[in-house]
């Protein structure tokens, strides 16, 4: 499909897209601040220039836009010039993976939050997951005797034997 804008119109439109202080970033930053976490923004000396840096906990947080970083959400797929955008997004994803690997190799904890995870329906769950992840990091840095095990889907062991279908207590 042909572009309906002149190059000047396209340039003006694209130049207005914000890369900093986006609404999803502000949601995360406000929540972190209210939880008592202090941070720096866009530290140039770190690979990928993370959105949020908590040096005390050696943790960086990237708040990624689903379109620009290729999350794959249905409503964030390009409608025009698809080939260009597909190549651009692949390059962005490769760059993101490279930056995250460099940060992890340097001993940083990397947390990625996607724009769609901060939509009103999922925001609370996402912030709870962030709270859990940061709690684990804080415990690890404070020398907790044993980290919490990762939650998995394996069957749990019950403290009591399973109830019989004929048991009068089960009604």
Task: State where each predicted segment sits.
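Nucleic-acid endo/exonuclease domains
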Residues: 1-112, 116-171
């Amino acid at each position: 499909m042909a572009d309906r804008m002149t190059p000047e119109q396209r340039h003006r439109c694209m130049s207005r897209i914000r890369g900093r202080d986006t609404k999803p970033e502000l949601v995360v930053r406000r929540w972190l601040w209210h939880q008592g976490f202090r941070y720096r923004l866009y530290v140039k000396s770190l690979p990928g220039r993370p959105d949020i840096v908590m040096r005390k906990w050696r943790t960086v947080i990237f708040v990624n836009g689903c379109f620009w970083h290729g999350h794959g959400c249905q409503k964030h797929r390009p409608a025009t010039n698809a080939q260009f955008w597909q190549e651009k997004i692949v390059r962005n994803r490769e760059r993101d993976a490279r930056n995250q690997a460099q940060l992890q190799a340097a001993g940083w904890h990397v947390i990625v939050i996607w724009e769609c995870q901060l939509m009103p329906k999922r925001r609370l769950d996402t912030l709870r997951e962030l709270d859990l992840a940061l709690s684990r990091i804080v415990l690890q840095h404070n020398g907790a005797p044993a980290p919490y095990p990762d939650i998995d889907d394996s069957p749990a062991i019950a403290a009591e034997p399973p109830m019989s279908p004929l048991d009068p207590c089960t009604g």
